[in-house]
Amino acid sequence: MRQLAIYGKGGIGKSTTTQNLTAGLVERGNKIMVVGCDPKADSTRLLLGGLAQKTVLDTLREEGEDVELDSILKTGYAGIRCVESGGPEPGVGCAGRGIITSINMLEQLGAYTDDLDFVFYDVLGDVVCGGFAMPIREGKAQEIYIVASGEMMALYAANNISKGIQKYAKSGGVRLGGIICNSRKVANEYELLDAFAKELGSQLIHFVPRSPSVTKAEINKKTVIEYDPTCEQANEYRELARKVEENDMFVIPKPMTQERLEQILMEHGLID
């Protein structure tokens, strides 16, 4: 069983990328579980046909400790198992703790069955606080992929996440598997992301182009592969799935200084 965490700044398209990637992996004959670790709880919406899934934390609040697995785990597209950890009530508590509670509960309830090939954690990545770092810190996820684009803030976040990975890689077995570019159609985007990934000592594992097919599929509450399996974008996600499945480049990243990051941005025309 490979356990992967997908990080990236808010709004970058992590959840969309993760769900489309898992749809590609399931086509390749893999059994998959997706654990949403974002308080927005939208990490499994496209796999469940838009059903707002009840989160682990909501279920715990309503039902107390006595929770059955089938009340927090729903089966979605092509048998993908879907869980949302959810978040605390606004203004109270820590969302990171929710992730810890959820993963512990899934373990106790026997969700991690031997037939699973992949478990994905879709994690909010602007803040690499202890709770959100939990999938890396506790050695749950061995592989991290960062979703980024050619925008400055996306790369700042990706560099910060790399610092978190570097910190926990020394004690645990966590490694960076690569950067996934979710294109924003910024000038020189491919070259910039490729240079950024190489500077970290990693790779740009795939460049996902921007496409109206993604929005159309989302409006229809489906992944692109389910909604329009023959379109070009569906093949992009299949290619991403192949590259992730066959990936053998796992590194402890070398995060860069602010100055070096800005230098790379300047070299590729993002800062004048």
UniProtKB/Swiss-Prot annotation:
The reversible ADP-ribosylation of Arg-97 inactivates the nitrogenase reductase and regulates nitrogenase activity. Binds 1 [4Fe-4S] cluster per dimer. GO terms for molecular function: 4 iron, 4 sulfur cluster binding; ATP binding; metal ion binding; nitrogenase activity. Coiled coil: none annotated. [4Fe-4S] cluster binds at C94, C129. InterPro entries: NifH/chlL_CS (IPR030655), NifH/frxC (IPR000392), Nitrogenase_Fe_NifH (IPR005977), P-loop_NTPase (IPR027417). Keywords: 4Fe-4S, ADP-ribosylation, ATP-binding, Iron, Iron-sulfur, Metal-binding, Nitrogen fixation, Nucleotide-binding, Oxidoreductase. Its EC number is 1.18.6.1. The keyword Electron transport does not apply. It catalyses: N2 + 8 reduced [2Fe-2S]-[ferredoxin] + 16 ATP + 16 H2O = H2 + 8 oxidized [2Fe-2S]-[ferredoxin] + 2 NH4(+) + 16 ADP + 16 phosphate + 6 H(+). It comes from the Bacteria. GO terms for biological process: nitrogen fixation. The modification ADP-ribosylarginine is found at R97. The keyword Transferase does not apply. The key enzymatic reactions in nitrogen fixation are catalyzed by the nitrogenase complex, which has 2 components: the iron protein and the molybdenum-iron protein. This is Nitrogenase iron protein 6. It comes from Clostridium pasteurianum. The gene is nifH6.
